[in-house]
């Protein structure tokens, strides 16, 4: 990552990674790999140095400080090249050793780079200053980055954990460990800050929580200030040390959004509340309150602002330079507000804190002449009592005179001052601890939300390892916790990692890193360990700290290597024992441990607390359980009952839960390092840091990372992600197993195939290889995208070029035309043509102008209209767009809901499958357990028999002891003059008797008894030795006593082993039980979540049911409106019948009036015809109305059914489309993310290209340097050739080899130049060739170094040869002068010379080997280049395939976009049609109401006519004149009659016209109705397209209905107005009637008219009677149908209610069944669990038996082997003796030979050279024989020693086998007891299961009955519905 990319980190960049300039400087820095080393140093551990010389296995070097030191060669360690300076991951170092790690950390720390990767974990060093590396800019830069993509940081660790959680769907944990003051708390806060920020990015919409106090992420962050105020304090090493441990779990939803959080705390240091060391202080909250930042607090708490006024908090320092208590108080108070604490809760906490300060000031004194305490002043007590809501006198009385329970009564007990002070401190500590725990619980309640949570990330911040001058019980608990965490780290890093390799079948040799801390852990927590002994001592009333110390020393001193006796130093606190922890040796002081562990309280004061008026204090102690055991006489304090639980036991329980939680997660480790003890920024204390690195296992973690396979991927995931590297290796359409596909793919890649291994399910990679594959993948994607971009740019360029060509052609045509015009424009005829041409067209032009003006006018009008239309359409478009947006939002919401529902459904299905599989597995295990239970029962009986035998043995031992006692008494009678030692012997024997009884009572005292018996035996032995001369009889008794002691010792050891094994197995079983309980709880939680989701789905279904019911209610409203129309029609029928009745009355009156004329008869006939016509019209209208109503009812029913079906279909189609949409959306997101990654990879590759060019330049310069060095070597070789003498032939051969090496180097240099040119030409392959260039450069450096070594060796060889030549010359001269005397020296010189020649030959061979290796390197590079070219071609092919896929995807996307637009247009058209239908319906209703109004008008006219007839009748009756008189005026009346007749005809014409209007209105009504039906049919068809908007359409219909209602009201208003007009017309008509009456005074002319009228009336009466009969029949039929319909509705409602009741009963029964089923399932699971435990015990018993058998066989074999080895030893001893004799003989022979040699020398002086040579040959032969004999002798001695060791090993193995046999036998006894307990539990579980099964069957029976009742009710409902439909059908047919 270059500087430009680091710009994203802002001002933090220099503190995270070194700059590009610094990296270049490091690469060019001079460095000598052979001379630059590290040497050890007493003060600094290691220092850098330069080697000056090497001599005799020692090295002389000059340190960087100028000091010259000489050290052994094996103590010298090489430095890494400068390019590795400040490396970010120390696993990448070339030379991995302690000084390399130390100096890398030191150099990074000097540049303020405090974070460094160390293999799989991160190391951070406390900077002791603020660094700008935690701001929001840095958080954003690290979000979503891989570990290799960003510098080391705590944010990177956090983001990796977050990504692992989402991808692996596994809970994560981050363990931040280190010593106190190393920076754990700060890093924990940064982790929480990071998670809160990235979770808030995905959840910004949730601004405020239900509390209204702040967002969830704010609350999580603000929990820290509150916890730190009450739980952090200043210590010697840390100003803000956490004095409690916390495990913060941050829960996330399935999508990674923040869901909730919770905090678990461990081991608050209560003692700090009342006591602090000098350099420390109390918890921060005390000093924050006293800072006077909030003066109202001081007034409320009745305190001053001086800390020294309060004893509890002023024992150490009171201020800290780095902490502003005033600002911290405001931060704490603000944190309480954000966390939702009420004012009352905050004030209560402040009051209790102030009360504790006043508590420390309460003083007490002794009463005069009494050992009784009394208060020394009550002021402080009054203040404390006031703040705590207590009575001051009661508080003081409870402290000084507490009430204790003795038997069944309470008595008052006196207390001395020391006891009262202790009780006061204990109460203060208890109040503070419980208040702290309450605060944590309150914070957890705030952080707990109702949001669904899927996974969590736990952050562990626990008190670091502590080594103080004074270490007490709290330090032991803290250090024990850190020991367990370090063991967890070691086990995870070094054991589980290697076990994973074994499990996957990878060839791996197990490496023991020596990091096992189990011995120290067992010493603390196992039975008879420190905590076990402490708890045991707490049970005994008279136990003290010293008895606890004595037991510790008796059990562990000398027996455990981790337990030591301390060295007390003057000036330091006393220490009682020492423990060797992983971080160092700690001296512990045990004063007060028993009290701290029991933690007793004054119960009288606690009872006052329970009754306090301060609610918080009373709630804190509401659940306190006191001491119920009565006090016996002579005993000081009461013992706790069965509920007693010590602090150590509680801590171990919490610690075991924590470790269980951590084991269930994927851990990430952060190691915090403290750089110095003085808190100085930038200073590294080398010894201190090295000690922490060694303890933390940093080097071992790096080694396992480098040697092992830290990265692993499942085969399927690997194939999916990396197939792009070589798609041809895994064909697309062919099925290939994932593992085979991965093997083919990796085999086809150009990588080191030794860097990965194939397991059974995963492929494993060494460190760095996975990163290389990622780089190759990024490069491949970059090439593909580059190709796509090139093709796209090519297409665009070709399109632009085509446009340019077309433009050019157009320009050429224009130019040609202009040139032609310019050639003819001056031609006279052309000028004439130009002048005449306009004149010819002037007339036409004028016409055209006129037409154009008209056209312009029209267009202008059209434009105005179109503008108006456009504006109208724009307004409509705006409204439609708004509606569309609303619909889209609604659709999006529905899609989101549907997606969530589908996701929940899938999760439920998966969980169901998993649970079913687990149920099946547990069932099988239960069956196996039952079988094994029977077998174990039989074995249990056998073991009980063995136990009875053991009891008999114990009885025999008791008898033996009784005999010993008798003999002891007899001895006492015989020997009266025993000394004081004999008296001591008597006391020891008495103790032995008591201890024997104690052994029978309790096996827990076995170990103490054993020690006592050993002391007794020793004393007895001493007494026996002293008194052996005086008491011979006592000797026999003592021997018997020894035998008894041995028997007891064996029995005790056996019992002790039994006890230990039993306790261990119990603890293991408890752990297993806890794990299974937690699993059950987890499964219960998952089941509850599933039930909640099911309830949500049911709620959604109920909502849909409500919507359907609303639609049905709407339909019923429409039916009611239709019924109203029917009632209106019935009213019309009633009016018609009334009219008929009135006509009948008129006809009767006319008949009474008498005769009728012919004119009247004709008029009657005419009116009768008119009435018949009107009746037929009315009947037709009635039939039409009935038919219309029937059709409407049928249409309505059909439409309702079709709408229901369409709604169902639409729901299914909607689900399908939403699913497809989500799939395409996911694909689009994937493609988008891939494009972004490809673009980023391209940018990275371009930057890498520039870097590679720089590296090429460096490589070129280095190659030139290499060439110069080769030339220098060639010149040196020429010089050496001139200097060599006699060895010229050999040297020539060597020089030829050297020249060959030189040529190879030159050739290699030339190849490098070629490679450089190829790199320049092949830009696309730069990334791959970069690795080759780096390796080549490294090889070149190594070759140059090797060449220098060869040159030096060669120069040394030449010097040796020249020296040898001189020596040869000297020896030649000396031999000539004195050959015989110097023969031996000459031989030695020859040997030396031969040795040197041999060394030279070996050097030459080494040079040859290096040359061959260079040749191999060259070939390898050529092969890599060829492979890279193949990769390039493959990448091109993959790019083409990807381009094709991209085009296909674009097509699919375009199709879906088109479908979406079509659906939108269809939606708009359907909305328009709906609006048009609503307007048509409104018009239709208006027309219908107008027809009703016309009908009313006709009725009124008819009524007026009837009144006119009645007036005429009255006039006829009143006229008593004679007919003669009437005849006179007949003529006048006839004239008037004609006028009236014409008027009547006009009225009839108007009546006919109105009837025509009615008919036309009826026809229009029918047409509109038909049109409406047609459009409704079309609407039904289009409802398929408007599926998502049916609810909106219903709303629009509701709106239109409201509009219709308003229009109907308007029509009624118009109707009333018309009725008023009609009344006025009626008045006018009455006036006309009066005129007619005056004209009708002459009745004669009207008699004929009356007769006609009478006839017509008769006909009308008859017709009216017929109509009345028909109407009566129809009304009766209608009434019957109406009654039946009402009865059917009542029946339907009754059945509906019964059905609902049945369904409710069914639901309740189902719930009961489900509850019983869950109970039964839990019982079955318990049963299976017990069966699994039984099977495990069975297997353990079988394994134990098998191990016993194996041990017996091994013992037998060892005995035989021992016998054989003894025989071999004897043989070897004989051989050795023989060889010794031969050696002596050979020595004698050598002496003889030496004597003969002397004689030979004398003869040589005389005899010459031949005799000397013979003697020398003989001497050499003898020397060879002597050496061979000595070798054989040495080998025989080695064999003898080896045999002795083998015998010892076999003896030891036999002893171990015997011990194992005894231990296994004890284990069998123990397991038998466990089997019995499990059998009992299994029987109980089986009984409970049977009970639940019977309940289940009962409920199942009730459920069946309820279902039967529901079926019966449903069948009745169906029958009634069918009957209702039949009746309705019959009624319609009859009508």
Swiss-Prot record:
Q: What is this protein called?
A: Myosin-7
The UniProt annotation puts the region (Disordered) at 1907-1935
Gene name, please?
MYH7
Q: Which organism is it from?
A: Bos taurus (Bovine)
Q: What is its main location?
A: cytoplasm
Domain Myosin N-terminal SH3-like stretches: 32-81
> Mind telling me which residue stretches traverse the membrane in this protein?
none
Answer yes or no on keyword Transcription: no
Give the UniProt subcellular location, in the record's own words.
Answer: Cytoplasm, Myofibril; Cytoplasm, Myofibril, Sarcomere
List every position bearing Phosphothreonine.
Answer: 378, 1282, 1309, 1513
Q: What else is known?
A: The cardiac alpha isoform is a 'fast' ATPase myosin, while the beta isoform is a 'slow' ATPase.
Keywords (alphabetical) are: Actin-binding, ATP-binding, Calmodulin-binding, Coiled coil, Cytoplasm, Methylation, Motor protein, Muscle protein, Myosin, Nucleotide-binding, Phosphoprotein, Thick filament
Please verify whether the record's keywords include Metal-binding. Answer: no
Coiled-coil annotation: which residues?
839-1935
The Myosin motor domain covers which part of the protein? Answer: 85-778
User: Which positions bear Phosphotyrosine?
Assistant: 1308
| Pfam families referenced in this protein's UniProt entry, alphabetically | Myosin_head, Myosin_N, Myosin_tail_1
Which residues does the UniProt record annotate as the domain IQ? 781-810
Q: What family does the entry list? A: Belongs to the TRAFAC class myosin-kinesin ATPase superfamily. Myosin family.
- In this UniProt entry, the residues modified to Phosphoserine are 1137, 1269, 1510
Where is there biased composition of kind Basic and acidic residues?
A: 1923-1935
The cross-references to PANTHER family, in alphabetical order and at most eight, read: MYOSIN HEAVY CHAIN, NON-MUSCLE (PTHR45615), MYOSIN-7 (PTHR45615:SF1)
GO BP: any one term: cardiac muscle contraction
What does the entry list as the binding residues for ATP? Answer: 178-185
- Name the segments for region: Actin-binding: 655-677, 757-771
Main function: Myosins are actin-based motor molecules with ATPase activity essential for muscle contraction. Forms regular bipolar thick filaments that, together with actin thin filaments, constitute the fundamental contractile unit of skeletal and cardiac muscle.
């Amino acid at each position: 990552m270059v500087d430009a990319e680091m710009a994203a980190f802002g001002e933090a960049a220099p503190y995270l990674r070194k700059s590009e300039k610094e990296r270049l400087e490091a690469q060019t820095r001079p460095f000598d790999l052979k001379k630059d080393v590290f040497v050890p140093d007493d003060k600094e551990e290691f220092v850098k140095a330069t080697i000056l010389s090497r001599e005799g296995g020692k090295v002389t070097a000059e340190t960087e400080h100028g000091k010259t030191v000489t050290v052994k060669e094996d103590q010298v360690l090489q430095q890494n090249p400068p390019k590795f300076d400040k490396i970010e991951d120390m696993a990448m170092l070339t030379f991995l050793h302690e000084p390399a790690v130390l100096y890398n950390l030191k150099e990074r720390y000097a540049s303020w780079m405090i974070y460094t990767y160390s293999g799989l974990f991160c190391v951070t060093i406390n900077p002791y200053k603020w660094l700008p590396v935690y701001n929001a800019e840095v958080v954003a830069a690290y979000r979503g980055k891989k570990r290799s993509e960003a510098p080391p940081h705590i944010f990177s660790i956090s983001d990796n954990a977050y990504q692992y959680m989402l991808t692996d769907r596994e809970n994560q944990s981050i363990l931040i460990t280190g010593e106190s003051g190393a920076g754990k708390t700060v890093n924990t806060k940064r982790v929480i800050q990071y998670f809160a920020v990235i979770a808030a990015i995905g959840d910004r919409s949730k601004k405020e929580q239900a509390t209204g106090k702040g967002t969830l992420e704010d609350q999580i962050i603000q929990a820290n200030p509150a916890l730190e105020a009450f739980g952090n304090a200043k210590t010697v090493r840390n100003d803000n040390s956490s004095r409690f441990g916390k495990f913060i779990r941050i829960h996330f939803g399935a999508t990674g959004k923040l869901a909730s959080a919770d905090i678990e705390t461990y081991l608050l240091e209560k003692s700090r509340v009342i006591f602090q060391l000098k350099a420390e202080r109390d918890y921060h909250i005390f000093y924050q309150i006293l800072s006077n930042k909030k003066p109202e607090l001081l007034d409320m708490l009745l305190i001053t602002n001086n800390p020294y006024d309060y004893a509890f908090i002023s024992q150490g320092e009171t201020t800290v330079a780095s902490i502003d208590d005033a600002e911290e108080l405001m931060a704490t108070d603000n944190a309480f507000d954000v966390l939702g604490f009420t004012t009352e809760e905050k004030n209560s906490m402040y009051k209790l804190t102030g009360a504790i300060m006043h508590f420390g000031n309460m003083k007490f004194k002794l009463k005069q002449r009494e050992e009784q305490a009394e208060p020394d002043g009550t002021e402080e007590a009054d203040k404390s009592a006031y703040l705590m809501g207590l009575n001051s006198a009661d508080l003081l009385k409870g402290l000084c005179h507490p009430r204790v329970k003795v038997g069944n009564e309470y008595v008052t007990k006196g207390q001395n001052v020391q006891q009262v002070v202790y009780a006061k401190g204990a109460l203060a500590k208890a109040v503070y601890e419980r208040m702290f725990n309450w605060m944590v619980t309150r914070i957890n309640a705030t952080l707990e939300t109702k949001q669904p949570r899927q996974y969590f990330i736990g952050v562990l911040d626990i008190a670091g390892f502590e080594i103080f001058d004074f270490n007490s019980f709290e330090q032991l608990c803290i250090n024990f916790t850190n020991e367990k965490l370090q063991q967890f780290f070691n086990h995870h890093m070094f054991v589980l990692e290697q076990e994973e390799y074994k499990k996957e079948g990878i060839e791996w040799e197990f490496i023991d890193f020596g990091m096992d801390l189990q011995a120290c852990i067992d010493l603390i927590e196992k039975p008879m360990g420190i905590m076990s002994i402490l708890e045991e001592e707490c049970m005994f009333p008279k136990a003290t700290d010293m008895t606890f110390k004595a037991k510790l020393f008796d059990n562990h001193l000398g027996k455990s290597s981790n337990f030591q006796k301390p060295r007390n130093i003057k000036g330091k606190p006393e220490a009682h024992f020492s423990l060797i922890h992983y971080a160092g040796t700690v001296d512990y002081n045990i004063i007060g441990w028993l009290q701290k562990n029991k933690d007793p309280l004054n119960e009288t004061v606690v009872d006052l607390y329970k009754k306090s008026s301060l609610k918080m204090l009373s709630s804190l102690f509401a659940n306190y359980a006191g001491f119920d055991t009565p006090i016996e006489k002579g005993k000081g304090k009461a013992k706790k009952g069965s509920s007693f639980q010590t602090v150590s036991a509680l801590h171990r329980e919490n610690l075991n839960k924590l470790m269980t939680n951590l084991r269930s997660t994927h851990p990430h480790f952060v190691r915090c390092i403290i750089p110095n003890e003085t808190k100085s920024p930038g200073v590294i204390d080398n010894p201190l840091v090295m000690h922490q690195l060694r303890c933390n296992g940093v080097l071992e973690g790096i080694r396992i990372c480098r040697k092992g396979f830290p990265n692993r991927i499942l085969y399927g995931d690997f194939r999916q992600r990396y197939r792009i590297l070589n798609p041809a290796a895994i064909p697309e359409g062919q099925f290939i197993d994932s593992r085979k596909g991965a093997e083919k793919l990796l085999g086809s890649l150009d990588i080191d195939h030794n860097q990965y291994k194939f397991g059974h399910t995963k492929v494993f990679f060494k460190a760095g290889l996975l990163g290389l594959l990622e780089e190759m993948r990024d490069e491949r994607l970059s090439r593909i995208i580059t190709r796509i971009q090139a093709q796209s740019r090519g297409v665009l360029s070709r399109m632009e070029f085509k446009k340019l060509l077309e433009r050019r052609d157009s320009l050429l045509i224009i130019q040609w035309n202009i040139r032609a015009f310019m050639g003819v424009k001056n031609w006279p005829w052309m000028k004439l043509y130009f002048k005449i041409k306009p004149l010819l067209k002037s007339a036409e032009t004028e016409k055209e102008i006129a037409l154009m003006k008209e056209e312009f006018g029209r267009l202008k009008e059209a434009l105005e209209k179109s503008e108006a239309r456009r504006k109208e359409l724009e307004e409509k478009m705006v409204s439609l767009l708004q509606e569309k947006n609303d619909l889209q939002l609604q659709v999006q919401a529905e899609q989101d809901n549907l997606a969530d529902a589908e996701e929940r459904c899938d999760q439920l299905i998966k969980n169901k499958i998993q649970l079913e599989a687990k149920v099946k597995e547990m069932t099988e295990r239960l069956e196996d357990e039952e079988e094994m239970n029977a077998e174990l029962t039989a074995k249990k009986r056998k073991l009980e028999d063995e136990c009875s035998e053991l009891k008999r043995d114990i009885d025999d031992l008791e008898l033996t002891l009784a005999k010993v006692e008798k003999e002891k008494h007899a001895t006492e009678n015989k020997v009266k003059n025993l000394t004081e030692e004999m008296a001591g012997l008597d006391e020891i024997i008495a103790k032995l008797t008591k201890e024997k009884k104690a052994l029978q009572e309790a096996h827990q005292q076995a170990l103490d008894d054993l020690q006592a018996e050993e002391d007794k035996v020793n004393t007895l032995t001493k007494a026996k030795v002293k008194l052996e001369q005086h008491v011979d009889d006592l000797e026999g008794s003592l021997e018997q006593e020894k035998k008894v002691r041995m028997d007891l010792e064996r029995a005790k050891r056996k019992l002790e082993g039994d006890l230990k094994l039993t306790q261990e197995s119990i603890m293991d079983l408890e752990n297993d039980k806890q794990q299974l309980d937690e699993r059950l709880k987890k499964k219960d939680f998952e089941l509850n979540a599933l039930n909640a989701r099911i309830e949500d789905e049911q709620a959604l279904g109920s909502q849909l049911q409500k919507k359907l019911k609303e639609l049905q209610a709407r339909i019923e409203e429409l039916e009611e409106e239709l019924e109203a129309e029917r009632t209106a029609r019935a009213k019309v029928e009633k009016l018609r019948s009334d009219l008929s009745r009135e006509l009948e009355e008129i006809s009767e009156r006319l008949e009474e009036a008498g005769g009728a004329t012919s004119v009247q008869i004709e008029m009657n006939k005419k009116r009768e015809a008119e009435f018949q016509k009107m009746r037929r019209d009315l009947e037709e209208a009635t039939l039409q109305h009935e038919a219309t109503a029937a059709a409407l009812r049928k249409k309505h029913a059909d439409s309702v059914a079709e709408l229901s079906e369409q709604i169902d279909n639409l729901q299914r189609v909607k689900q399908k489309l939403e699913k497809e949409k989500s799939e395409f959306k996911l694909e689009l997101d994937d493609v988008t993310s891939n494009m972004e990654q490809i673009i980023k990879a391209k940018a990275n590759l371009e930057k890498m290209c520039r870097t590679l060019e720089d590296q090429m330049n460096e490589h070129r310069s280095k190659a030139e340097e290499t060439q110069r060095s080769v030339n220098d070597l060639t010149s040196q070789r020429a010089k050496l050739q001139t200097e060599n003498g006699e060895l010229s032939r050999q040297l020539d051969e060597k020089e030829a080899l050297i020249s060959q090496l030189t040529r190879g180097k030159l050739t290699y240099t030339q190849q490098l130049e070629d490679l450089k040119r190829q790199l320049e030409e092949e830009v696309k392959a730069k990334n791959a060739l970069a690795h080759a260039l780096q390796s080549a450069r490294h090889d070149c450096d190594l070759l140059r170094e090797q060449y220098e070594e060869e040159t030096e060796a060669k120069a040394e060889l030449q010097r040796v040869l020249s020296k040898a030549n001189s020596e040869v010359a000297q020896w030649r001269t000396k031999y000539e002068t004195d050959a015989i005397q110097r023969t031996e020296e000459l031989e030695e010189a020859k040997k030396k010379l031969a040795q040197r020649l041999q060394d030279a030959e070996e050097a030459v061979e080494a040079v040859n080997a290096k040359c061959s290796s260079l040749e191999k390197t060259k070939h390898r590079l050529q092969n890599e280049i060829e492979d890279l070219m193949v990769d390039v071609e493959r990448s091109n092919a993959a790019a083409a395939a990807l381009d094709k896929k991209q085009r296909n995807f674009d097509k699919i996307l375009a199709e879906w976009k088109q479908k979406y637009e079509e659906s939108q247009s269809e939606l708009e058209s359907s909305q328009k049609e709906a609006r048009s239908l609503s307007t048509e319906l409104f018009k239709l209703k208006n027309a219908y109401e107008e027809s009703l109004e016309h009908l009313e008008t006709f009725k009124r006219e008819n009524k007026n006519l009837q009144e006119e007839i009645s007036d005429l009748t009255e006039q006829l009756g009143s006229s008593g004149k004679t007919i003669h008189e009437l005849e006179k005026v007949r003529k006048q009346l006839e004239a008037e009659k004609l006028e009236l007749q014409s008027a009547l005809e006009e009225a009839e014409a108007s009546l006919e016209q109105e009837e025509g209007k009615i008919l036309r209105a009826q026809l229009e009504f029918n047409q509109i109705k038909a049109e409406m039906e047609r459009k409704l049919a079309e609407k039904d068809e289009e409802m398929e397209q408007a599926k998502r908007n049916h609810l909106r359409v219903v709303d629009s219909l509701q709106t239109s209905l409201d509009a219709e209602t308003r229009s109907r009201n308007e029509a009624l208003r118009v109707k009333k107005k018309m009725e008023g007009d009609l009344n006025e017309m009626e008045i006018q008509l009455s006036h006309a009637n009066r005129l007619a009456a005056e004209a009708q005074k002459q009745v004669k002319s009207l008699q004929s008219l009356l007769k006609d009228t009478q006839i017509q009336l008769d006909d009308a009466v008859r017709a009216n009677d017929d109509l009345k009969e028909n109407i009566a029949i129809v009304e009766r039929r209608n009434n019957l149908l109406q009654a039946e319909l009402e009865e059917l509705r009542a029946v339907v409602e009754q059945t509906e209610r019964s059905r609902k009741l049945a369904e409710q009963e069914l639901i309740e029964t189902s719930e009961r069944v489900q509850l019983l089923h869950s109970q039964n399932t839990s019982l079955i699971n318990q049963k299976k669990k017990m069966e699994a435990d039984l099977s495990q015990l069975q297997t353990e018993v079988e394994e134990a038996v098998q191990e016993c058998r194996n041990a017996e066989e091994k013992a037998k074999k060892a005995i035989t082997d021992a016998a054989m080895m003894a025989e071999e030893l004897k043989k070897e001893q004989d051989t050795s003796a023989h060889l010794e004799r031969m050696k002596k003989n050979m020595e004698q022979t050598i002496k003889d030979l030496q004597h003969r040699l002397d004689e030979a020398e004398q003869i040589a002086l005389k005899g010459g050279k031949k005799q000397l040579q013979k003697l020398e040959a003989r001497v050499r032969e003898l020397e060879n024989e002597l050496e061979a004999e000595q070798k054989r002798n040495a080998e025989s001695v080695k064999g003898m020693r080896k045999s002795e060791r083998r015998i010892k090993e076999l003896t030891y193995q036999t002893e171990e086998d015997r011990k194992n046999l005894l231990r296994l036998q004890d284990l069998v006894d123990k397991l038998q007891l466990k089997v019995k307990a499990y059998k009992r539990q299994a029987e109980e579980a089986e009984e409970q299961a049977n009970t639940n099964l019977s309940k289940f069957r009962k409920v199942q029976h009730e459920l069946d009955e309820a279902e039967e009742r529901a079926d019966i009710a449903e069948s009745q409902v169906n029958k009634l519905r069918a009957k209702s439909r039949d009746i309705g059908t019959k009624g319609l047919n009859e009508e």
